[in-house]
A protein has these predicted regions:
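Bacterial N-terminal signal peptides
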Residues: 12-24
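Channel- or pocket-lining gating/hinge segments that regulate access to a cavity or pore
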Residues: 207-209
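Bacterial N-terminal signal peptides that target proteins for export
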Residues: 2-15
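Intrinsic low-complexity/disordered segments
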Residues: 1, 26-28
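Feature captures the catalytic cores and cofactor-binding loops of soluble hydro-lyases/lyases
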Residues: 29-197, 211-253
């Protein structure tokens, strides 16, 4: 390839570009498309870790007119970003049941792959601890991204000590053993949102969102675009000191 340079400025620009590419090793790469993400689950989850949960929620609403966010009751108990594939457990009341009745909630942990998110629904469970320190330790050791419990949790000081992200409806010292029966790998309704095994679950300080697995790649690409637009607006707003002008220019609020 022959390059025609017409000025000293052009030479400087060309040398600078070459230095960035060859010496710095920084070359802009095109962002993967939905098809690429759909074919690579690890890439998909890694990308979901870097988008804001609010943008994921907006993407689902704009693309499918679908509510995907869990009620504000489900909030961070042990802070941290969550992004992974749902492993689901339903806990139903079974007063006086044998301890073995909750064995499936343990099996769900021990058979789950890395980057899973433990999603448990405890029937009338605001005053029942669905998980505690032992279960969180096992999840953490197996590489879970975090846990989302429609119910209570306990051993909170330890959850924070090991920095394992947990979102739940509250904190309570009780146990489910002897009071509940567990079923694993079934669709559940957590915080008002239907979650099936393998769906994408993301959570941050803004809340929790579940994305159906068959549309997860498309939703991700839309969320990335929304993130990019919003982040571009911050400096524009600060410079012009006008929200209205920024909204007119970027078309996002």
């Amino acid at each position: 390839m022959r390059i025609h340079v017409t000025s000293r400025t052009s030479v400087s620009f060309l040398v600078g570009a070459l230095l960035i590419g060859l010496v710095g090793g920084v070359v802009a790469q095109p962002q993967p498309d939905a098809k690429t993400y759909a074919a690579n689950p690890a890439l998909l989850i890694d990308a979901y870790r870097h988008v804001e949960v609010a943008s994921v929620s907006d993407a689902l609403e704009q693309l499918y007119n679908k509510r995907s966010f869990m009620t504000h009751r489900i909030h961070a108990i042990s802070d941290g970003k969550i992004a992974g594939f749902a492993v689901t457990v339903q806990m139903d009341k079974a007063e006086g049941s044998a301890p073995s009745a909750v064995t499936p909630m343990q099996a769900a942990i021990d058979t789950a792959p890395k980057d899973s998110v433990y999603v448990m629904v405890v029937q009338d469970g605001d005053d029942i601890a669905g998980i505690g320190g032992l279960m969180a330790t096992a999840m953490n050791a197996r590489g879970f991204s975090g846990a989302v419990i429609d119910g209570g949790v306990r051993d909170v000081a330890y959850l924070k000590k090991i920095a394992f992200p947990v979102y739940a409806s509250g904190i309570v010292p009780s146990t489910s053993v002897g009071h509940y029966r567990a079923t694993q790998a079934v669709p559940v309704t957590a915080g008002g949102v239907r979650v099936s095994p393998g769906d994408i679950v993301v959570a941050d300080a803004d809340g929790v969102v579940a994305v159906p697995k068959d549309i997860a790649a498309e939703v991700l690409v839309k969320a990335q675009a929304l993130d990019q637009t919003e982040h571009s607006m911050y400096g524009y707003i600060e410079k012009l000191r006008s929200l209205e002008e920024a909204v007119q220019r970027f078309g996002r609020l």
